[in-house]
Amino acid sequence: MSESNDFEKILGVDKIKSMRENAKLKRMSDGKGCTLCDYTGYTTSDNGKAAMCSCLKEQFFKELFHKANVPKAFWNKTVADWNTRTDNYGKDLGAQQNISEKIYSLLSFYERNLGNICRGKFPKLKHTYNVVREVCSIHFEGGIGSGKSFIAAVIVQSAIRRNLSAKYYDWTELIQILTDFEKKEQADEVLEEFKELDLVVIDGIEIYSYNHPQLSVHLDRISKARIHSGKPTLLFSNGNAQQISTGSGWNSLLKSCLTIRLPYIK
C-alpha cells in the first residue's frame, strides 16, 4: 500500500467516502434529489455559489401544497392545462367552447394580477355587456365536471409559487369543523386564517338537506372576517350558494364576488 493510501486511511477518508455514497444511495431510494445535483439537492452556480436545485424547490412546493390542502390529483397543474375543447370527463363542449376560451383568458388575467390583487391593487376587467369593474373575489358556478376543483387547485398553487399565503378549503370539511363542538380550536384557527391569508379558496359549496343550528353563526363569523381582511376569496359552487340560509356576512361575501358561470355539458 502506498504512503498516500496509508495517510488517507489514518484520516478516515475511505470511511467518509463510504458514508457519502451510502447517504447518496439513501436519498436516491427515498426519491430525493436528481442527477443534476448528484442527489444532494444543491448545484453550483456560475459564480461558484451553492444554489438550490430545481428538484429540491419542487419538493419544497409539494410540502406547501400539502399544507394548503391542495388535492393531490391537481399538484403541478397550471392554468395552461385548462382544456378549452372538453370538460373534465372528455365531453366535447361544442358551442360552449367559446365560453371555455373566455374562462381561460380570465384565469390567465387573474393569475397575472394575483400579486397586486392580494396587495389591494385591483385590476379592472370588462365583462358581460361591456361592464367594467374591479376584480378581487370571484364566485365560479358550474355543474359536475365543469372544472371548479381544477381552477381552485391551480390558483392556490400559483399563489404559493408567488410567495403568497393561500389555502384550499373543501366545503364539506369546512362545515364539519364549524359545526362540531369538539373542534372549537380548529374553528378558531379557520377564523384566524380567514383574517390573515392572502387568498382563501372554498370549493364544493352546496346546500345540504339538514344544516346544523350553529352553521349560520359560524359561517357568518368567518365570512365577515374575510370581508374585513380586504383580500381575495374564490368560491366554487353548483349554483345555489345564494340559497344557503345564513347571516349577512355570507350574503355580503357572495355579493362582493364577480359571478362567473363555467361551461357545462349535461
Describe the residue ranges of each PLM region.
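Phosphate-binding P-loop
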Residues: 108-135
